[in-house]
Amino acid sequence: MDASTLFTRLETATASFRNLERQLADPDVAADPKRLESIARERSRLEPLVLDFEELQRLESERDSARQLLKDSRGDAAMEELAQDELASLQEQHATLTERLTLALLPRDPRDERSVMLEIRAGAGGDEACLWAGDLARMYERYSQKVGWAVQSISCTEADLGGFRELILSVRGDSVYSQLKFEAGVHRVQRVPATESQGRVHTSTATVAVMPEADAVEVQLDPKDLDISTARSGGAGGQNVNKVETAVDLLHKPTGIRVFCTQERSQLQNRERALEILRAKLLEREQAAAAERESSDRRAQVGSGDRSEKIRTYNYKDNRTTDHRLGRNFTLEPVLEGQLEDLIGACIAEEQRQKLEALSDQAEA
């Protein structure tokens, strides 16, 4: 991105920021909580950009003064050296800030700010795959807790020997999708299962889908397309187990998508959860189809989000996690403990690099 384009975009962002501040002072906006929250969120997103732009302008002014001082210092060796040092420092600060602002202005995925439904399904490997799905769930729960996101299991099918055949987690917080979107795909594990008596390494898989939450306005459901039935929730015993039909089995007839919810205490709550999951699945399907139509774009991304894409291998013997999109290895144990910062940060950096490359290609075209 050349300096002129960068400056123009920063001026536009600053104008938007000032407009949002005026709107926040409007009594009509203050009386509408949903609109107020939306405007406040966008203002918070733009504020660091505006402050950095002001700092960039200050640096440019000081840099011009340093250049003039250097010009005026010809013949005075001591003053000339001071001016050169000052100019070098200002140029370094300017370059660093320019790079940061360029990255901040890269095209944003409008879904990045959203909370998500995280679906984990056991793949190849039988009982070991179910155990692996459970390990992945714990990994994401630990990471989410570390960064301050709220995690709740909203649908699960437990396996006989532990773990899950299928699990859906609701992960809510700031910019959840912007980080967890890189987790979509096939996660492969290579280890000796607890049930293996001869010490042989087995390979198992689990598939992760990351679905941004969708609201009722965004994905409208026709009641005629829904087949909703209830069932008795299973449990470990107790007075109410298998006596009250609180579980909800939801079928979306046009797509065949089925959602079964048992985690909430009441039938109404399970019904609402099932509808949330269905909306997220339908939105994911719609956006995946749109991305497929723009296949050249999709293939260039760090991860296409395709459920069938093998993104990572976890090798217990070598204590190594390999991210195949990055071609990089990470230490296994911290990753499984939810220390995903370096791994996700590397994915974000690669995505930014690819976006910068695409902008450069467009500029040259």
Curated annotation (Swiss-Prot):
Aminoacyl-tRNA synthetase listed as a keyword: no
Segments of this protein annotated with the region Disordered: 289-316
Keyword hit for Oxidoreductase: no
Main location: cytoplasm
Any GO CC annotation of this UniProt entry: cytoplasm
Residues with N5-methylglutamine modification: Q239
Gene Ontology MF terms in the entry: translation release factor activity, codon specific
Job of this protein: Peptide chain release factor 1 directs the termination of translation in response to the peptide chain termination codons UAG and UAA.
Recorded family membership: Belongs to the prokaryotic/mitochondrial release factor family.
Protein name per the record: Peptide chain release factor 1
Gene name, Swiss-Prot/TrEMBL: prfA
